[in-house]
Every structure is written in C-alpha cells, then in structure tokens.
Amino acid sequence: MPQPTIKVISGPTVEIEYAGLHLLTDPTFDPETTYDLGGGASLRKTTGAPVEAESVLPLDAVLLSHDHHPDNLDNKGRELLSQVPLTLTTRDGEKRLGGNAHGLSPWEEYEITSTQGTKVTVTALPALHGPDGDDTEEIIGQVIGFLLTAEGEPTIYISGDNASLKVVEEIAERISDI
C-alpha cells in the first residue's frame, strides 16, 4: 500500500489519501467573500481556494469538524457534500445536515472499508472550539477532531478546529502512538 499523502488545499481543507481511501477535511471552496453571521457579526474570507471543489472528486468521505461556521464548511463545501457518500461530523451536525451525514461523539469509532478491502477506523476525538471552560461548547457549538488508523499504516491525528492544549494532552494520554 502506498504511503499516505496529505495535501493542504486552503484553510482547514485538506485532501488525504490513506489506506486506499480518498478523504477531505472541512471543505471550503468559496471565492473571496463576506459571510453575515447575524447579530451584526460577519466573517471575511480574503482568498478563495486554489482549486474548484469538483477537482477533489470522487471522495470516499468528508471528515467535517463542525458544520455551523462558514470558515469550516462554506457554500461550495455544502454543495460538495451531496456528491460524497459519507460525511462524518458531530452529532449536532448530523441533525442539521441530514443526507449522508453521520454524527459521532468523542471517542466513538466508525469503520470504512476501502475498495482494496482495507479496514480504516475513524475515531472522533474531543476538540474545543474556543477557550477552555465548562460552557464553551454550549456557546460555540460542538466540534470534533479525527484519528485515522489501519493495519500497516501510520496513525494520523486531525485536530479539527481544536484550540485547547488541554484537549491535546488528554488525547495523547489515551492514544500514545500518534
């Protein structure tokens, strides 16, 4: 089996070839734009992706850290999800997205079998999208990272949109071989 390849497309969007699977994280393909977040808040995207969303197809799955902010899932990224057989995301994200979305809680596993028959385990990992604190998730929303494992392959940790070193330490204590 060839070594995994990781290609940064832009921002949080990364194309991954792993154990015979073609994966994509947090699809963002909109051109430069400003998103209205409501309440007078906005988010300005200063640069579009260097490739069109369709150029990454076909995909086996999208690993979506969270769906509720356009800097991790923009309009063209949302359109792309309908062309992908599986989107792994948060439990709340599954409810909002529907369709091919499958929600995971931290430490929950999902197995995908590649066309070559390799079983890849995707483990949802805890992540914190903002400052440490008991009410952060309630205010900012759920976010997860991912761990990719397969026999004979290196382990890959995808932090998602995690901003907490404490969470990384917790993951490192539980999974020593990253």
PLM regions and their residue ranges:
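Conserved beta-strand hairpin/beta-sheet module of binuclear metal-dependent hydrolase folds
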Residues: 2-52, 138-160
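Metallo-beta-lactamase
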Residues: 3, 86-154
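Short beta->alpha connector loops
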Residues: 10-12, 68-70, 93, 128-129, ...
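A short helix->loop->beta-strand "cap" motif at the edges of active sites that frequently abuts
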Residues: 21, 83-86
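Pre-active-site segment of Zn-dependent metallo-hydrolases
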Residues: 21-64, 75-79, 130-133, 162-176
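Metal-dependent catalytic neighborhoods of phosphoester/phosphodiester hydrolases
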Residues: 73-83, 93-94
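Active-site beta-loop-alpha substructure in enzyme catalytic cores
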Residues: 155, 175-178
